[in-house]
Regions:
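N-terminal, intrinsically disordered, polar/charged segments of Gram-positive cell-envelope systems
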Residues: 2-13
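Beta1/beta-strand and adjacent pyrophosphate-binding region of the FAD-binding site
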Residues: 11-28, 44
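Gly/Ala-rich phosphate-binding loop of Rossmann-like dinucleotide-binding domains
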Residues: 33, 37
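Glycine-rich FAD pyrophosphate-binding loop
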Residues: 38-59
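Short, solvent-exposed loop/turn and secondary-structure capping segments
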Residues: 54-58, 68, 75, 170, ...
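N-terminal glycine-rich dinucleotide-binding loop that anchors FAD/FMN and/or NAD(P) in oxidoreductases
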Residues: 58-93
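Conserved redox-cofactor binding core of oxidoreductases
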Residues: 120-239, 258-261
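Glycine-rich loop(s) and the adjacent beta-strand/alpha-helix scaffold that form part
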Residues: 236-239, 243-303
Length: 303
């Protein structure tokens, strides 16, 4: 019997210098990298897993966006959805100032559209209203506004980078057709994650972004003033990889795959299985809190 042993040789420690270091090569991380590279910055992404994609590659639906050019290619027939949302806002969230204000604005927009029904009806405020109701009213209104107000621009940005999500359909949590999905050469709707991630990776390669796989960041480096100036990571053979940078971007997602951390913040989820990618271990949160960052809503966990 011959035993084949894995190569246990430890690689040499290394140091890389860049303008920007990004932790996590999922959809957010690669988007940030492409954007920074487009501004002439040198970019390094540190990714703990052997492949890019994170949770994004697991997404099978599409991307929600309001007031897009692709929505206008559809005939509007979702009056009942709008009416139901306005009724829900009035009956269940009358004491929520944000939802009440959004519902008032949407009611005015809806009345104006009914008086002159041109194009496809949707608005940033209706998307905000749907999102606030979907979050049971505990969402951060400012973050919801940022998400919704920039959603159409995000669809346009993807288009500019050869990633087209032009099939618009209905989906849970939306009053109108708002989910944008990719279509293959045969005209069949396909999973957004497996479509988008390879194209984002291709854009990273074209932009000269360096992606370090199997490299787990475990410390944010700071200067004497407390400013983030890089990260320290561990490579696949245990070697130390130091990335010095002028800016650090954390796009590590949550901690749904770290069951100990899940139970710590929400004990009733003990024993639950997760749909998260293996890399969702909460490293980014732990690194950030180690240098003084605060946390919020830690019990709101995507399992």
């Amino acid at each position: 019997k011959i035993e084949v042993k894995a190569d246990e040789t430890k690689a040499e420690d290394s140091t890389v210098d860049a303008d920007v270091v990004i932790v996590g090569a999922g959809g957010a991380g690669m988007t940030a990298a492409i954007t920074a590279a487009g501004e002439g910055k040198s970019v390094v992404i540190v990714e703990s897993q052997p492949m890019v994609g994170g949770n994004s590659v697991r997404a099978t639906g599409g991307m929600n966006a309001g007031k897009t050019v692709y929505q206008d290619e559809n005939e509007f027939g979702e009056s009942a959805g709008v009416e139901k949302t306005l009724k829900t806002a009035a009956e269940k969230y009358a004491d929520n100032e944000t939802i009440t204000a959004l519902a008032k604005t949407v009611s005015e927009q809806w009345a104006a559209y009914q008086a002159n029904p041109t194009g496809y009806f949707d608005s940033v405020e209706l998307m905000e209203l749907d999102t606030m109701i979907g979050g049971k009213g505990i969402n951060d209104p400012a973050l919801v506004e940022t998400l919704c107000a920039n959603s159409a621009d995000a669809i346009d940005w993807l288009d500019e980078h050869g990633i087209t999500l032009h099939n618009v359909s209905s989906f849970g949590g939306a009053s109108v057709k708002r989910i944008h999905r990719p279509v293959n050469d045969e005209g069949k709707v396909v999973s957004v994650g497996s479509y988008m991630i390879p194209l984002l990776e291709e854009n990273c390669e074209k932009a000269g972004v360096q992606i370090l796989l199997n490299t787990t960041a475990n410390e944010i480096l700071t200067d004497a003033n407390g400013a983030a100036v890089g990260v320290k990571a561990t490579g696949s053979t245990g070697e130390t990889v130091t990335v010095n940078a002028k800016a650090v971007v954390l796009t590590t997602g949550g901690f749904g795959a770290n069951l100990d951390m899940v139970v710590k913040y929400k004990p009733e989820l003990k024993g639950f299985m997760t749909t998260n990618a293996a890399g969702a271990q909460g490293q980014g949160i732990e690194m950030a809190t180690a240098i003084g960052a605060g946390t919020v809503d830690m019990d709101q966990i995507q399992i």
